[in-house]
Amino acid sequence: MTDITAVTPFLADAAAAELEDWGPLEEATGEPMQTAGYTLWQDGEQEVGVWECTPGPSYWKLETHEFVHIVSGRMTVTPDGGEAREIGPGQTAVFPRGWAGSWQIHEKIRKVYVIF
């Protein structure tokens, strides 16, 4: 039986978390963009972690829902056929399954994410 009283795993400070090199961003549409991250928890369908990426343009078509909370940096997200919106530190967004559009990362971005 799973102990639901324990709070694990735990990350005290997403801004200071040590990240692993995750290599180049496959979704990049310009110069290569480098990513790093830390997976806090995953179960095969859902995942929680910290992700960081260098500046540049990218294009996404999401196959899952994604919740993001920006820790540092800023980017402009533009859904296909929609309006651009800038997201920066302290802001939160949800990208529903099927969301498609571009992310223009202006400054190295670090986000806490939940894929579900």
Predicted segments, located by residue:
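Conserved hydrophobic/aromatic beta-strand scaffold that supports enzyme active sites
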Residues: V48-V50, F67, T92
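A short hydrophobic beta-strand segment most commonly corresponding to one strand
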Residues: V94, E107-F116
